[in-house]
Amino acid sequence: MERLNNMGKNSIKKVTVVGTGVIGNGWISRFLSQGYDVVATDPAKNAEVRMRQSIENAWPALEKQGLAEGASKDRLTFELDLAKAVADADLIQENVPEREALKRRVLAEIDHFSKSEAIIASSTSGLKPSILQEDCQRPERVIVAHPFNPVYLIPLVEVIGGKDTSPETINISEQFYQSIKMKPLVISTEVEGHIADRLMEAIWREALHLINDGVATTEEVDAAIIYGPGLRWALMGPFLTLHLAGGEQGMRYMLEQFGPALKLPWTKLVAPELTNELANRVVEGCEAQTTGYSIKKLEQRRDEFLIELIQLLEKYWPGANLKGKL
């Protein structure tokens, strides 16, 4: 613990990424773009080939956004052996599939093979850190650091400690993620799904009901968000959006006038059964929306849009942060 106490964000020089799927590769791209040495490991067949292709696809967007001094794709090493991959790392970012038993086993192995002062961060989208750290000998250095796709562009990362996580680990992690141009949201209370995913899941469930009940197509649901609340949500969250909707009296008027409507049975909340019929309608709808575009092309268009959107956010909402008032 004493060695961990002496660490800071500047002590993190080498990063290891465990698991090179979409999220893992996103982390690799971000770390490299910020000038870090990165070791990646994944036992899957052809993992290294797919990883390097993913980084190549992301790099033009990162160059447009601006690379840190010393940033290079050449600072990436692939190591098949987990023990060797984590041995010298100052921070290990775990991204294995979202299965509790698997994550606990891998995190315990990382804990065993890594340096005692290294921070171990899980990218889990839903599991509590207290559960993930149960099999670790040094649970005080284990946290959840949940990012959002594409990780190399989206700044939010939810940072959560478990019951045994030390305050030092949280502080160092927060500083580190800030240093790589992210917006760490430190969540003090553990809950499944953290914050952002719980909000997104609520919308996702309602969207599935609208498709299942024949109310709308996937394209119409997406359009309802893109040209409506999505534009406002890019600048303000649900609370500030409704605060403005209340006029001069703000949220107080909003709650007085529309609070009773919360009891109307509009929303379903519980997800519909994902039958083959519903799944097919969703898949076919998405494929129809993207006719003529490859996933790679769509990712490039998304990245270009996000870069400009993030720049606009900083221009019009420069005071927004996670520590104080706007």
UniProtKB/Swiss-Prot annotation:
GO CC annotation: cytoplasm
Enzyme Commission number: 1.1.1.108
Known pathway: Amine and polyamine metabolism; carnitine metabolism
Root EC class: oxidoreductase
Any matching Pfam family: 3HCDH_N
Main localization, broad class: cytoplasm
InterPro entries noted in UniProt: 3-OHacyl-CoA_DH_NAD-bd (IPR006176), 3HC_DH_C (IPR006108), 6-PGluconate_DH-like_C_sf (IPR008927), 6PGD_dom2 (IPR013328), L-carnitine_dehydrogenase (IPR026578), NAD(P)-bd_dom_sf (IPR036291)
Highest taxon, organism lineage: Bacteria
Subcellular location: Cytoplasm
Keywords in alphabetical order: Cytoplasm, NAD, Oxidoreductase, Plasmid
GO biological process, one term: fatty acid metabolic process
Catalytic activity: carnitine + NAD(+) = 3-dehydrocarnitine + NADH + H(+)
Gene Ontology MF terms: carnitine 3-dehydrogenase activity; NAD+ binding
Binding sites annotated in the UniProt record for NAD(+): G19, T20, G21, V22, I23, G24
UniProt keyword annotation of DNA damage present: no
Annotated family: Belongs to the 3-hydroxyacyl-CoA dehydrogenase family. L-carnitine dehydrogenase subfamily.
Record's function text: Catalyzes the NAD(+)-dependent oxidation of L-carnitine to 3-dehydrocarnitine.
Assembly: Homodimer.
The name this protein goes by in its record: L-carnitine dehydrogenase
Organism: Bacillus cereus (strain ZK / E33L)
